[in-house]
């Protein structure tokens, strides 16, 4: 029995100030999550930027997919080394390095004037993204108290969606400036413009704040323990916990479990990645962590976010400005839903949130796919056949849908009830005009005609948009947050960094697999077919997690062996520490005035 003396008359906080979070812990979470904000800003915002960029710089589907996905591909590679760097040099070091690289990437974007310079800046941003995503959730989880870990780790998701919303909003707001609005929100080129300076300040200030102020925040206490710096671990806990009693109690807990594990390692040898491959339990942990991010991506979230403005245009919204504002509104809704989800993450079990989210996402995707199916079936016919296009590929199409599915053609129509229109070839240097006919730049009759290079007018355009909004609302509390939270809780200490790193790599790899060929997949399967495919993957995820997903809430990070699998066969563990746990049940006596209260640590941590 270990005795901890305290005189405390504050009865409302419960045992050991159970529900309080220190100001330092809040600051550590916020400044770490700035990396998530920059991640969301630079990746999600490309959705709206792409609509404006392709108006100024001729970009076919390949270049659009490349500029969107190159950041994700580089992030997948850098996240592989992010875990090793975080283990070697510390979580703080990697997070600050990522902030500096984000700053460099933003500055390089300033001079972007063509495809190549845009591509280089996106590669630099991808490097920072991978380092951020492999270290920030790890740092927040290891610094957080068990009772608020889900809430605090979820702040990273809030900042990611917040960055996404801000970038979409700025792109919509500046999108009308001579076709160069995409420059101003990401800071490029004409630095003499006042609004460009404001945008530059926003893009770079979060990175600067993270690099500077993160220096004064504590390192992860568990990282200190892993490197034998026990006094530093104790000092870090004193700064991160609301009072000395909480810090001392948690220090004794993690020190005892650390000593127990070290004794076990001395007797059985230190575990390695090969240890994981010999046990169904650790294989199950590893596969579950990866599958959560895999399904997060193949259910379509980043395809929807990255191409939201394009999807809204595909639904039949006529003007670029309206589609940009609708994309900003959809990302704003997702941001709000993520904030609301913070209220749910510690009130409901992780498993319940995940399964409920998947069910609603499944229904939402059916609505989107059905809407696009109705739009395709009601596509306007080609009623005006331009003599100059009869010998071209555009002259052979009979409906608007078949016309716009070809990258070389677009639909030119009069904005009337009957939607009389023709299929005309696009130009080589811009999507704004057709090469010939009423929608060409030279034709004097361009005014009353509308040029639709990638979409068709339809009375059903509202259905996919409603489904898109329902999808974002449904996705946020489960698939949006839970993969980050559960991955931070699944792994034992010796597997945590590599586990989070590999799971993050899986996240980016499947992100790349989905987003890189997204527009090409739409060309191949059609809009409705693409979203029916996402619907099928969501159903697979629902079945998989119903069968295999365990509950991880309320567990201490040093006791992942407490996880109860849905299938008993996964309970086998090669490193069962029960034989070394004679000292694992510590009882703490808290003296409060004249009363004595006894607390069993294992009971408290399982609440």
Range-by-range predicted roles:
Residues 242-249, 563:
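Short arginine-rich
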Residues 2-238, 262-415, 420-607:
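Transmembrane-helix signature of 12-pass secondary carriers
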Residues 247-262:
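Short, well-structured alpha-helical segments
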């Amino acid at each position: 029995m270990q005795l901890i003396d305290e005189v405390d008359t504050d009865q409302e906080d419960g045992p050991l100030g159970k529900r309080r979070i220190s100001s330092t812990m809040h600051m550590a979470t916020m400044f770490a999550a700035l990396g998530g904000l920059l991640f969301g800003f630079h990746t999600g915002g490309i959705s709206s930027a792409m609509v404006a960029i392709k108006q100024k710089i001729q970009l076919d589907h390949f270049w659009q997919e490349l500029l969107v996905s190159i950041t994700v591909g580089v992030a997948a590679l850098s996240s592989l080394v992010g875990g090793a760097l975080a283990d070697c040099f510390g979580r703080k070091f990697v997070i600050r390095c990522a902030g500096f690289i984000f700053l460099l990437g933003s500055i390089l974007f300033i001079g972007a004037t063509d495809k190549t310079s845009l591509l280089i800046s996106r590669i630099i941003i991808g490097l920072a993204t991978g380092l951020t995503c492999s270290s920030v959730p790890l740092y927040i989880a290891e610094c957080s108290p068990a009772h608020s870990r889900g809430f605090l780790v979820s702040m990273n998701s809030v900042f990611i969606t917040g960055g996404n919303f801000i970038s979409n909003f700025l792109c919509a707001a500046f999108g009308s400036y001579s076709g160069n609005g995409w420059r101003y929100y990401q800071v490029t080129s004409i630095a003499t413009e006042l609004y460009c300076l404001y945008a530059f300040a926003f893009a770079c200030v979060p990175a600067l704040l993270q690099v500077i102020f993160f220096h004064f925040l504590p390192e992860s206490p568990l990282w200190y323990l892993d490197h034998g710096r026990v006094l530093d671990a104790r000092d870090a806990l004193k700064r991160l916990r609301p009072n000395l009693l909480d810090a001392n109690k948690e220090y004794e807990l993690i020190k005892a479990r650390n000593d127990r594990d070290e004794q076990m390692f001395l007797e059985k040898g230190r575990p390695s990645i090969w240890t994981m491959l010999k046990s169904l339990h650790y294989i199950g942990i590893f596969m579950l962590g990866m599958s959560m991010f895999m399904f997060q991506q193949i259910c379509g979230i980043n395809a929807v976010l990255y191409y939201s403005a394009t999807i809204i245009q595909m639904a039949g919204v006529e003007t670029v400005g309206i589609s940009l504002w609708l994309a900003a509104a959809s990302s704003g809704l997702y941001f709000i839903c993520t904030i609301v989800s913070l209220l749910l993450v510690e009130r409901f079990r992780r498993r319940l949130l995940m399964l409920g989210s998947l069910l609603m996402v499944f229904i939402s995707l059916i609505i989107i796919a059905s809407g696009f199916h109705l739009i395709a079936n009601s596509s306007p016919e080609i009623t005006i056949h331009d003599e100059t296009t009869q010998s071209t590929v555009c002259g052979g199409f009979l409906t608007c849908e078949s016309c716009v599915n070809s990258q070389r053609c677009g639909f030119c129509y009069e904005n009337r009830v009957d939607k009389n229109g023709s299929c005309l070839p696009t130009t080589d240097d811009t999507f704004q005009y057709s090469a010939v006919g009423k929608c060409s730049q030279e034709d004097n009759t361009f005014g009353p005609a509308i040029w639709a290079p990638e979409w068709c007018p339809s009375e059903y355009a509202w259905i996919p948009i409603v489904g898109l909004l329902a999808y974002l609302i449904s996705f946020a509390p489960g698939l949006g947050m839970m993969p980050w939270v559960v991955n931070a809780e699944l792994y034992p200490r010796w597997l945590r960094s590599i586990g989070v790193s590999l799971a993050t790599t899986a996240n980016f790899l499947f992100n790349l697999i989905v987003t890189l060929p997204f527009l090409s997949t739409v060309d191949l399967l059609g809009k409705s077919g693409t979203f029916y495919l996402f619907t099928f993957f969501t159903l697979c995820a629902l079945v998989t997690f119903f069968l295999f997903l365990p509950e991880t809430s309320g567990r201490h990070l040093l006791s992942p062996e407490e996880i109860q699998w849905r299938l008993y066969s996964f309970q086998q563990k090669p490193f069962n520490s029960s034989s070394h746990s004679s000292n694992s049940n510590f009882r703490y006596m808290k003296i409060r005035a004249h009363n004595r209260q006894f607390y069993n640590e294992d009971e408290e941590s399982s609440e």
